[in-house]
Amino acid sequence: MIITITGKPCSGKGTVSKMFCQKYNFEYICTGDMFRALAKENGFDNILTFQLNEDIKKIDALVDNQIIDIGKNRISENIVIDSRLAWHFIPQSFKVFIDVDLNVAAKRLLEANRENENTILSFI
């Protein structure tokens, strides 16, 4: 069974996915990790520089194709995919969407030190 987990930023997608996988012995796949690994393999060590480059579309396509391949060839395996769009590429997956209150998401983002506080507060 393939489970695709998506949701709003800072909703806990990764945390929930990893906890589920550990408890039920599923394989964990994160498309964000796949994307970063492929970007690094293609010479993009600085993600900010990479985001400004047109090659982002090529890496996106590689990740999408890997997810499609998993959906076609590994459908009987126990896998959780933490991804924004895997549900779209694997229509037969069990789909989970995790929601989060905007204030909770902002607090999590601040606590994780992912961004400048002023940038986050302007988002709220």
Predicted feature locations:
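Glycine-rich phosphate-binding loops of nucleotide-dependent enzymes
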Residues: 98
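P-loop (Walker A) phosphate-binding loop of NTP-binding proteins
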Residues: 8
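Hydrophobic positions on the alpha1 helix immediately C-terminal to the Walker A/P-loop
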Residues: 16, 20
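ATP-dependent small-molecule kinase phosphotransfer cores
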Residues: 23, 27, 31-90, 103-104, ...
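Hydrophobic anchor at the beta1->P-loop junction of P-loop NTPases
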Residues: 5
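Conserved lysine of the Walker
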Residues: 13
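Walker A (P-loop) ATP-phosphate-binding motif of ABC ATPase nucleotide-binding domains
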Residues: 2
